[in-house]
Amino acid sequence: MASLYFVTGTDTEVGKTYCTAKTVERMRECGQRVGVYKPVASGCELRADGQRYSVDAATLWQAAGRPKNIDAVCPQRFLAALSPPQSAAREGVKVDTRQLRDGLAIWCDGDFDVVMIEGAGGLFSPISDDWLNVDLAIEMKRWSDQNGHSFELLLVAPDRLGVLHHVISTSRAAESAGIPIAGLILNRMDDHADESTQTNAEDLRRWCGIPMVASVRQPSGPLVVFSGPNGRNASGETSRETAGGVNFLNQTTIRR
């Protein structure tokens, strides 16, 4: 059965796609068969051949080695750079809420050890007229439990002053929804980092007890995975092994 990871952010434009792609590449280097699924994308480009091009979906597909086809990676693609339901409304249609979840099944056919699912925006951003991202994650976890797959959240947040509140509130909301968190990636979006970047990772490990905390030191730099003393997390427990024996990023530095 597959290990499923739902990637969400504390906001939009925090580097979810970059971090997801780097994670996918590392897992493939470790011998994992990785599928990628982006249920819906907005802000797509309309090509001359009439195809809708999502740079995020294409980036994930390329990182995974181009499995299946781009329509399986991202079956719903809209043009306006708005939230998915607003972007769809501009075209006189609605996001197909059920397809958001049902499109996952094609990636859980036994061909993949790991499936990375990238949401749209933050955990409480609307993804359709009926659901927020958290609602989709809950539905996917329910489906995963019924079909014998594991399901966890991977959180991406900007590494800057104020991130403690955003990560703690998001992680507690996820836990209240019954969604376990596999890890956190802090993305340093600005070359001029503030002083909080020296302590954010350690503070979040202590306050959240998240098993894995990583940091992208710049958008073009390496992804460095931090661990607690003796490879233990903030709660003192040995880090969980997921993704077919890979301890998520396994204290690995991923270089662009």
UniProtKB/Swiss-Prot annotation:
| Amino acids binding substrate | S42
- How is this protein annotated for GO cellular component? cytosol
Residues of the active site: K38
Q: State a single Gene Ontology molecular function.
A: dethiobiotin synthase activity
Q: Pathway, per Swiss-Prot/TrEMBL?
A: Cofactor biosynthesis; biotin biosynthesis; biotin from 7,8-diaminononanoate: step 1/2
Q: Return the EC number.
A: 6.3.3.3
Q: Where does Mg(2+) bind?
A: T17, D56, E118
State the InterPro entries in the record: DTB_synth_BioD (IPR004472), P-loop_NTPase (IPR027417)
Stored CDD domains: DTBS
Q: Which reaction does it catalyse?
A: (7R,8S)-7,8-diammoniononanoate + CO2 + ATP = (4R,5S)-dethiobiotin + ADP + phosphate + 3 H(+)
Q: Which GO terms describe its biological process?
A: biotin biosynthetic process
Kindly give the Pfam families that the UniProt entry links to this protein: AAA_26
Q: Which family does it belong to?
A: Belongs to the dethiobiotin synthetase family.
- PANTHER family named among the record's database cross-references: ATP-DEPENDENT DETHIOBIOTIN SYNTHETASE BIOD 2, DETHIOBIOTIN SYNTHETASE
HAMAP family attached to this UniProt entry: BioD (MF_00336)
Question: What is the protein name given in its UniProt record?
Answer: ATP-dependent dethiobiotin synthetase BioD
Encoding gene (name): bioD
